[in-house]
Amino acid sequence: MLIASCSSISNKATTHTYYIAADEIQWDYAPTGKNQITGRAFSEDENVFVATADDRIGKVYIKSVYREYTDDTFSTLKPRGPEWEHLGYLGPVIRAGVGDEIKIVFKNNLSIMASVHPHGVFYTKDAEGSPYNDGTSGADKKDNMIHPGDTFVYEWSVPERSGPGPNDPSSIVWMYHSHVDSPKATNSGLIGPIIISRESGGYASDVDREFVTLFTVTDENDTYYLDKNIQKFTKGVDDTDDDDFYESNLMHGMNGYVYGNLPGMVMKNGERVRWYLIGLGTEIDLHTPHWHGHTVLFNGNRTDVLELMPASLKTVDMTLDNEGTWLYHCHVNDHIKAGMLSMFTVLPK
């Protein structure tokens, strides 16, 4: 096994170390088997995306995801607490504060090349995780594409320009993803959040609860696993360019769940909640997250709808004052019909 590392980091800073692997899994976009928004079985129109047939994959797909382990043996998965159940297929939350350092011990358990490329934090060319003709060579290229079975250590720092700005709340969200054929990699599932706080450690002391939501139309036609999914879940597909087949593999999800199947969105009245929003995708990924029954503060402005473009990142705050179960969804009409809907529940104190 090849183990490589990028340049050394300061001994004076607090270093946050994460053991993260890229793993292949089977993912169910609707594990309850029904539309939780309506409380009924999927309709004919909804079954376009979730029903299995001789020539349709359905709601379960082979994907690649980032998963956190307890140490560099990568033998034991680190348990994900109930407060992060809602992350779905997103990778683990990477946290740090301004002035801290981040160390990612990354193992590629896939059969294809992968990397870890961060947004927002400071990295040198030997820790960028992105292959392109940038004029570098030698050690500066080792981070770009990690071979199957190999391990690489990425080291990033968090200067002031990576943390919250003057109009931001006390913590903000960035993201990380594989940049080896980035569209195919992110459609396959290789993406996760980075949370940076003004305070060292990456935790914000002025909030009670945090949620991360990715809004994206995952194009399962453009992943590493289309042929493998066809082989495993269908009896064969004659024409993968067929419009109906193509449409059936466009999964309009939030954290990899459709039609209200996103779990774990539970909080208590009176709590201060911070929402970290991530947009990703292509030209159809123009999203408008909307919360029912509550409002949020974004850069000092109050609203209940935001706009998300592909690769955009937004952090908003909500003070809970309205008990009940509330819709949280993209307000684009086509995305509503295709299942980009979830719910959050506000319990009594």
Features from the language model and the residues they span:
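C-terminal motif of bacterial Sec signal peptides marking the signal peptidase cleavage site
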Residues: 3-5
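Copper-binding active sites and cupredoxin-like electron-transfer domains
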Residues: 7-349
